[in-house]
Amino acid sequence: MASIAAERIDRLHTLARAAARTGDDDRAREYVRLARRLAERNRLTLPPAFRRFTCDDCDAVLVPGRNARVRTRSGHVVVTCDCGTHARYPYTG
């Protein structure tokens, strides 16, 4: 059962990115919400790429330069959504 849910989460992530590329942000948000709910109900963790490129507050698919600002600081990357939510990710280099 979990593998079916994981496949569906991957498919919803692909659909959300495609919808965001075409400018259909509402549909992309709905796909993100469905994937998060599916992961929650099946006790699955979301893939790292999914977590990194979606906003935790407004469920938007983050596209750098369009609805997200990306800044590098010493030791971490700061991604800011249009809604104002910040996410920090460590990096080495």
From Swiss-Prot:
Its EC number is 3.1.26.5. It is found in: Cytoplasm. Zn(2+) binds at residues 55, 58, 81, 83. GO terms for molecular function: ribonuclease P activity; zinc ion binding. GO terms for biological process: tRNA 5'-leader removal. It catalyses: Endonucleolytic cleavage of RNA, removing 5'-extranucleotides from tRNA precursor. GO terms for cellular component: cytoplasm; ribonuclease P complex. Its main location: cytoplasm. Consists of a catalytic RNA component and at least 4-5 protein subunits. This is Ribonuclease P protein component 4.
